[in-house]
């Protein structure tokens, strides 16, 4: 295949041999000298055995070492050496290899929320011990100063220490961040109308296709790269149709009858609330009422299980207005269940507990408060 694509020319062969030598280098210093001989750079970072080093060539020390070697050869004590051997020996005597991190942090992509204008750099952190690489985010402030970078690195990866300078960090990231990939983000789970995509934890649905998140925690959909920042809501989704139990509609009817199917229709309809509002301007509420022990909780928990979530809802009277708003904005095209709305009252009609002003929900009807 490489031959057919014209990738086996002499210059290509030299590059492959160089890459192989880097891979097989026994020590960090051997690897550093290979890179210097190839690139001619006198300062650079390099990784070896999942540790990070900084290579520096002292040109004055190199010139002095070379002169001493040549003088030793001409005066007799030093055996004859070729120019290449003299150069290599002088390099060994004039280079400094400084360990700057006991791990290897790599910038993978830049993620940005266009609505909130928040942005982060997403990094992979490899360590020299067994185990998968860890991943996490750094802010712009944390990648511009060594002290802040060191704190965040240690926060994300246990025992990971960066001991280099701010200048070394800047030069290292200058190469890593050049033309870095950009990933768009949303801060909720569910349907993104702007991208016409459902983001459901480890899976996404776009144009009728089910997609799985890649190893770097985002979805690639054509030219679009996107991810959800909402991690607190977990959906356990089974994508294997062969293992799915298809007898549940019968059990739902036997347990709850037509009322169960009405709730089911509303529940499934919530998956398309944004699309319905785009056509009809609104999507209705559903109120499930009944005597104690009639199965309201069982029905709601069952419907949630259809969406892969072990959940019932939240009690708005036990939350602040800001807390309720956070709950409403965590999802899009997924149900929001408010439970225990009816309260016993004391004589005179006053409630035992603080009540909720249900007028708060008026603008949720047309999607202005909740998606």
What are the functions of these language-model segments?
Residues 8-228:
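N-terminal nucleic-acid engagement/recognition segments and initiation subdomains in replication
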Residues 276-278, 347-350, 367-371:
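Conserved Walker
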Residues 217-318:
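P-loop NTPase catalytic core of nucleic-acid-dependent motor ATPases
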